Amino acid sequence: MKTAIINIGQIVSGNIQATLTAGDAILREGENLTKVGQISEKDIEDSDVIIDAGGAVAIPGLIDSHVHITFGDFTPRQNTVGYLQSYLNGGVTTSISASEVHVPGRPKDPDGVKALAVAAKKCFENYRPGGMRVHAGSLILEPGMTIADYQDVLSKGVWLAKAGFGAVKSASDYIPMVSEAKKAGLFTTLHTGGASIPGSFPITGEDLININPHVSFHINGGPVSMEDKYFEIVARDTEIAMQVCTAGNLRTTILCAEMARKHDAFERFLIATDTPTGSGIMPLGLIYTISQIASLADFDVPALIAAATGNVAKCYGLNSGFLKAGCDADVVLIDAPLGGTQNDALAALKNGDPCAIGRNNCRRAKICWQE
């Protein structure tokens, strides 16, 4: 199927190096984008579906890189069904598991956590809630695991690994585990900051640097932040991606963004939610964090959208997150909210307001079926 989106007000690329794309149209064929910016009259005539954006802003589908997936569209943490479809209505077209740690009675032995990760991965290969793409199955690192265990899950399709909730005695125990997981080819993430569940312990800034994962999860606190001085050290002296989350400390979120920009490390700055957790379920979490940073600090909205799209895709090696030819056709239309003081979505977000999102309340876009 071919779909044309026309009369777009602005196109946000998802690329932190060039955040806006000139033009007013996007063409999709099958599951991929084929043209972004300019399309021909023939492209429009040949399309099966034509969407008139009516001046709305097009952005890449948002990627939430910190979602505590379990099984199905259900979270036992808040006993809620349908939360992933709600996130889709909030513009999130891709969710990435932050480990299936909330599964009731979840195993803590190597064989058990391996089986859990593989089962989650396999289930979501066959299930897309509301159409959302879910990268599930994040291996929880537990004592006794070896490089053979990491290679075993990799051979079954699992590529994510999470440190921070295992039954280790101290944070330093994760240093060799994360190192071996990385050598095996797993993409490693680390709980950062204060303890978030009973029986766990804090991961300090010094621990983070020593463990050296690919991504520091909720570096701004999950929900309690690490010491301020480490934000500059991580941005300046490491290659660790700095993920800030809605369910964390807003002050250190802005501090992290400022340090990332200061040290030319903004490509490693990621925006996520860290939900569902005790902090709740946040379908608009990414939108709120973008608007909060933009309105309280000197950051452009398109750059912050990139932190929740293209930056994440580049970090995790995904084919989504960018509005460019060849990428997954994940497109979200956003607009100024009804009753707001601003005239377009980007200005609304800069003003600290949430934006209207395409499928449920974008006031200008409409679908025209081509005969």
What are these language model-derived features?
Residues 258-337:
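His/Asp/Glu-enriched, well-ordered alpha-helical/loop segment
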Residues 159-280, 297:
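Active-site core of metal-dependent hydrolases
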Residues 328-371:
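C-terminal cap of metal-dependent C-N hydrolases
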Residues 83-112, 124-141, 155-168, 186-189, ...:
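Divalent metal-dependent hydrolysis catalytic cores, especially in the metallo-beta-lactamase
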Residues 1-44:
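N-terminal metal-binding scaffold of metallo-dependent hydrolase/deaminase domains
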Residues 77-84, 142-153, 198-207:
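Short, acidic/polar
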Residues 52-118:
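Metal-associated gating/positioning segment near the N- to mid-region
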Residues 9, 31, 55, 360-365:
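Glycine-centered positions in the ABC transporter ATPase nucleotide-binding domain
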